[in-house]
């Protein structure tokens, strides 16, 4: 009986020693495999071969599921998937990365902007709030949250975030534009015009600023000035079909139906469906 016990003990010890000796080797092989797939993934990214890069990063994660490197790998995987237009897959990858590193600011921002690209502002808002709870001066998070607040018509909250953003970065162009558009929404037309004029003067080749100011001028019924801005915007971006629609709408306000129809025809030629402009065409008759 004693001999049997000793034999069983020795056999168990051999197994333990075998596992103890083999485990580092297994981990080493897994790490080497992960490193191989990671290097390939980065190489494919540099070549802009995104499908191959995605597959390599997946293989890298699978090679060592418990590796600390998986935070970085899953984040890169999400970025590649996003660039491929696979937003749901990207969000899933970012979420898995957050399981390894909860409340990582960079990953939360990546997931928030992916949510916004999908139109899921509510989930983006949660991520942005988590970012700002951890890093109160995060400019990008302040901008995107202000944008969401504006869409919700929570104008006071939006203004507070824009003010915080501009206190941090007074020349933040998107922040300045966002605040001007917010003033426009709230009917502060002269203030909005002044802010947009400052942006136009600083960036005279930016068609977006010209169109935004034109919209304010139209609301103030300063049609001739608005027309100058739209003409300037079209000169900068002559293939933007929506600018021609905007000018056509202005021409209709000015009772210039022939000019309006010509701009609508131009928008159709640039790719807009004629049926989507049917109401405006009727006004040209």
Give a label for each model feature.
Residues 36, 70-73, 107, 141, ...:
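TPR alpha-solenoid repeat register
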């Amino acid at each position: 009986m004693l001999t049997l016990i000793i034999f069983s003990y020795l056999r168990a010890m051999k197994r333990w020693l075998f596992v103890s000796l083999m485990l580092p080797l297994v981990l080493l092989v897994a790490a080497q495999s992960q490193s191989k797939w990671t290097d390939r993934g980065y190489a494919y990214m540099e070549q802009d071969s995104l499908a191959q890069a995605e597959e390599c990063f997946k293989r890298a994660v699978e090679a060592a599921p418990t590796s600390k490197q998986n935070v970085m790998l899953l984040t890169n995987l999400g970025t590649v998937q996003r660039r491929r237009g696979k937003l749901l897959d990207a969000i899933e990858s970012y979420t898995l990365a957050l399981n390894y590193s909860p409340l990582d600011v960079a990953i939360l921002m990546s997931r928030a902007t992916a949510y916004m690209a999908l139109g899921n502002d509510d989930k983006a808002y949660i991520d942005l709030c988590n970012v700002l709870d951890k890093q109160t001066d995060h400019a990008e998070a302040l901008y995107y949250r202000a944008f969401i607040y504006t869409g919700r018509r929570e104008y006071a909250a939006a203004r507070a975030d824009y003010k915080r953003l501009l206190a941090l970065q007074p020349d933040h162009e998107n922040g300045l534009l966002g605040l001007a558009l917010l003033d426009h929404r709230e009917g502060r037309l002269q203030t909005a015009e002044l802010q947009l004029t400052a942006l136009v003067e600083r960036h005279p080749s930016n068609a977006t600023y010209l169109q935004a100011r034109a919209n304010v001028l139209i609301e103030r019924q300063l049609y001739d000035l608005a027309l100058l801005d739209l003409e300037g915007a079209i000169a900068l971006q002559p293939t933007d079909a929506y600018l021609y629609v905007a000018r056509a709408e202005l021409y209709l306000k000015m009772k210039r139906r022939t000019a309006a129809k010509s701009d609508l025809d131009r928008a159709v030629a640039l790719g807009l469906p004629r049926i989507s402009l049917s109401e405006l065409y009727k006004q040209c008759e």
